[in-house]
Structure formats: structure tokens, C-alpha cells
Amino acid sequence: MWRGMIVLAGLLSAAGTAHANSRYFCSADDKEARFTLESGFESDAGHKLNHFRGALIVKDEAQSTVFGKRVFESQHLTNHWSRDGELLMEVFDGGGDDTDGATLDLVVVAGERGKPTANFSGSYSLTIEGGEKPYAVEGKVSCGTK
């Protein structure tokens, strides 16, 4: 009887682990930009997005008048991938009346497939198009799991 209960407890705990959610956070602060991103995905097939939020400050004076400070929500996360230690996120801000038609695209690529760790690093690229002149920068990003 005890063996049966131990096996049942083991199966239930394994089932709970299989359905746990994945939460990631990434941040960067360099001469070009300062941002934080936080996302949560279901571990089930498809990795459905639970939540996403973030904030960005563009430090370039020419760009800061349009995209100086931005807050991101779930609708801004246009692409994401998280699997086996690798994380990719694309954040797109289509602007609006306050940007005179300019758009912002922030892409984060971090981690290494096959080497999952609690803390990992990578790179980001930030592109602003549609303004007076195109703006594109790259930098390093630090990420982790919660």
C-alpha cells in the first residue's frame, strides 16, 4: 500500500512539473538604450503567452523625442520562442499619432540551445524606422528565469 501511495505521489508531482509555467526577464542598460522585459509562457505545447510587459528608454537624443520612453504590453510581443535554454523575443511598437508614423522593433536573442541555465546572456537589436533617418543599434542583454 505504501509503495502505491509513493508511486502515486511521484506521478502527481511529475505531472505538476510538466505543466509548470516558464517566466523570463531580460534587461540591458548601455549608452544606446535601457530596457526591461518580462514574459510568462505556458510549458504546454505551443508555449502560449500568459503575460508580457516591458519598458524602454532610448538614449539617443534625436530618437528620444519620438520613442524616448515606451511601455510595452502583451500586444507588442509579436514573436517569441523559448526552448531548451534558448530565448528569442521580438517587440514591435507600431507607434501611432505620437510617433508621426515611425515604428520601433526590438529583438532579443539569448541563451544557448541545449544549455539551459537560470541566468544567461545574449544580444539585442533596436531599429526605429519611418522617422527623419533610420536608427539601428545593437548591444548585450542579460536574461534569467523566475
What residue ranges belong to the model's regions?
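Bacterial N-terminal signal peptides that target proteins for export
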Residues: 1-6
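N-terminal signal peptide c-region/cleavage motif recognized by signal peptidases
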Residues: 14-17
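Central antiparallel beta-sheet cores of small beta-barrel/beta-sandwich binding domains
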Residues: 21-146
